[in-house]
């Protein structure tokens, strides 16, 4: 596909085997014109949609933006799960007359985070990736071919269970909150 101007990952001999070219894509930091930043973004978007197992991002600006985007998605997911768990477990830990003051806001926060994640991140191809920090896993990648000393490495992970978890907990928190609000105003 070199005729289309796309650069693919380089197969590298390793102790554990050869990494296939379809497993790793490198967004190289090569400035060849005034639209280099748009070219980097386009390459990253193409790599995300092609679902490479590893994506190495050399350009610092795009790498940092992508890492922040992934971190915000992770934060929303964790907040939805933890706030939902707090909503559901607070009635077990606090007296009934006080539990609603913690459980209802926690349930609302869980639902808000799960909804925001569903609207903003669910259909983004970047949500299937996590930033890789494990040096042992990074050593298997062709990082020696890079010009940047601090690339961002994304690894594709299945997020079906993660989405099910935070959606289930958020819906359970919603059901609990709806029940408590009904009890408060029905009496």
From Swiss-Prot:
One of its GO terms (biological process) is mitochondrion organization. It comes from the Eukaryota. The chain crosses the membrane at residues 80-96, 103-119. Coiled coil: none annotated. One of its GO terms (cellular component) is mitochondrial outer membrane. Keywords: Membrane, Mitochondrion, Mitochondrion inner membrane, Transmembrane, Transmembrane helix. It is found in: Mitochondrion inner membrane. It is a multi-pass membrane protein. InterPro entries: TMEM11 (IPR026120). Its main location: mitochondrion. Belongs to the TMEM11 family. Plays a role in mitochondrial morphogenesis. This is Transmembrane protein 11, mitochondrial.
